[in-house]
A protein has these predicted regions:
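A mobile, often basic/glycine-rich helix-loop segment
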Residues: 16
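Interaction-surface and assembly-scaffold signal
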Residues: 2-11, 107-239
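Non-catalytic surface loops within mature trypsin-like serine protease
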Residues: 31-33, 83, 234
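Amphipathic alpha-helical segments
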Residues: 31-43
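Residues in flexible loops and secondary-structure boundaries
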Residues: 35-37, 67-69, 87, 207-209, ...
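Structured soluble/peripheral alpha/beta segments that form catalytic or ligand/cofactor-binding pockets
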Residues: 8-12, 20-26, 45-163
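Aromatic-acidic/polar surface patches that form glycan- and anion
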Residues: 25-29, 221-223
Length: 239
């Protein structure tokens, strides 16, 4: 990761951008691979088939509490894709796959501008309603139209002797360019369970795109992370 700088709304950000405290809820859905591929064809990337004819879409809510981009909420639609040049399949391939970010609504203008400018993230302004209980629920809307709502039931704690650091990558597409975003994550307070999350789609155009995937109402796997630290480096152009 470099120490380059970017000026966003008069504020100088020195790379890597640091997120010191966040929490995340995520739901993993199994969808037809051909539908997922149609959704991301514009990126030039290939979805990862973890089973014959099946791909993975993750829907997540992240609450950024303390970081260089400020305090905000973020909803992500992430399609798991193979690294460029790979056509690997199966569960092992899924372990090597990365998230292509197709939707990324947020509720603060600074992170919107930074995300678009530095990494090509497809951020739009949206409204969030969160009920922090068990079950944990949230709705995300834009312009008065519901995109999605998800209800999460608490998962089982995953034991860890110490917070683990993971080196990851994410792909974005903006203005005809596909980029790879390197980032590192350190987390603790992890919970997972089979199922455990129920999806409700609205009438927003994003919701219609999600419906085109044949998303089931119930997730294959869901989870939460109570404490997340992240660093994001500069994006690299792929094509």
């Amino acid at each position: 990761m470099s120490d380059s700088q970017h000026t966003i709304a008069g504020t100088v950000l020195t790379m890597p951008v640091r997120i010191r405290k966040a929490d995340v809820h995520t739901a993993m859905f199994s969808v037809p691979a051909d539908a997922a591929q149609r959704l991301v064809d514009y990126s030039g990337l290939q979805v990862c088939e973890f089973r014959p004819g099946r791909a993975v879409v993750n829907l997540m809510l992240a609450r950024y509490i303390d970081g260089d981009l400020g305090k905000y909420h973020e909803f992500g639609t992430c399609v798991m894709v193979n690294p460029p040049g790979s056509d690997a399949r199966g569960l092992k391939a899924l372990g090597d796959a990365a998230a292509f970010i197709h939707h990324l609504p947020v509720d603060q203008s600074f992170t919107l501008e930074a995300g678009r400018t530095i990494w090509g993230f497809p951020k739009i302004m949206a409204d969030f309603k969160v009920r922090d209980a068990n079950p944990f629920t949230f709705d995300v809307s834009e312009g008065g139209s519901l995109i999605a709502g998800i209800e999460f039931h608490r998962g089982l704690p995953i034991p860890s002797l110490r917070p683990r650091s993971q080196v990851l990558k994410t792909y974005t597409f903006s203005e005809g360019t596909t980029r790879e975003v390197p980032w590192e994550m350190r987390n603790s307070g992890v919970r997972f369970r089979p199922g455990g999350a129920t999806l409700r789609l609205g009438d927003h155009p994003y919701a219609k795109e999600l419906a085109s995937l044949g998303l089931p109402k119930r997730a294959m796997v869901s989870g939460s992370v109570a404490n997340v630290e992240m660093t994001f480096g500069d994006a690299h152009i792929l094509r």
